[in-house]
């Protein structure tokens, strides 16, 4: 199933794999307890790339993504069950542990934004809007951390959203 959020340039790169065109995978982790977002790139060197105009932090600004070793499994583009993004980090560094410790002491969820770039064009992400999910589950052992990310739990949201109680709606009281 085609993904309408991808740019024509990255669709061509996926389809024909032209020589010299490299897809750069970036992740941005946001949490209320983080002083700054954690931005990483799956590469051996840091990159500076421009965020999209709708970015929640530093919109349309050139930011640095820190080189980091991670693996990711992108969600399928299907109409089936809720898609999941899997992120695996081996040999977790101290920098990441600081962020993980900050988030562990909070009930707020970590938001993750995946942005693919082309090495030849770092002026904007090649997916608009980028894929934004929340971390649902984290598994850790002495060698790696695996995070399962998904969209919000829409199936268990109350509908209608308003809770009709006597405080806000005193007319509900019957005599």
Q: What positions do the PLM features span?
A:
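Beta-strand elements of well-folded, non-transmembrane domains
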Residues: 91-93, 116-120, 139, 153-155
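Short beta-strand and beta-hairpin "edge-sheet" elements
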Residues: 121-150
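Extracellular/virion structural assembly segments
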Residues: 72-114
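A glycine-rich, hydrophobic loop/mini-helix early in the fold
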Residues: 45-86
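Short solvent-exposed strand/turn elements
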Residues: 143-165
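Ser/Thr- (and often Asn-) enriched beta-sheet segments in non-cytosolic proteins
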Residues: 23-28, 69-71, 86-88, 111-113, ...
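Ubiquitin-like/PB1-type beta-grasp interaction modules and other compact soluble beta-rich domains
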Residues: 162-175
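Polar/acidic, low-complexity leader/linker segments enriched in S/T/G and N/D
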Residues: 1-61
């Amino acid at each position: 199933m085609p993904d309408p959020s991808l740019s024509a340039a990255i669709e061509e790169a996926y389809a024909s794999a032209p020589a010299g065109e490299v897809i750069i995978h970036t992740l941005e982790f946001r949490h209320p307890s983080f002083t700054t977002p954690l931005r990483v790139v799956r590469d051996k060197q840091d990159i500076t790339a421009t965020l999209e105009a709708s970015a929640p932090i530093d919109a349309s600004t050139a930011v640095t993504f820190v080189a980091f070793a991670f693996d990711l499994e992108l969600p399928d583009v299907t109409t089936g069950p809720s898609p999941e993004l899997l992120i695996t980090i081996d040999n977790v560094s101290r920098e990441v542990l600081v962020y993980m410790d900050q988030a562990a002491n909070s009930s707020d969820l970590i938001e993750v934004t995946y942005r693919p770039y082309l090495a030849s064009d770092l002026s904007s992400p090649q997916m608009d809007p980028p894929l934004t999910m929340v971390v649902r589950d984290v598994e850790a052992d002495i060698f790696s951390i695996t995070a399962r990310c998904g969209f919000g739990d829409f199936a268990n949201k109350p509908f209608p959203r308003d809770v009709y109680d006597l405080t806000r709606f005193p007319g509900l009281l019957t005599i």
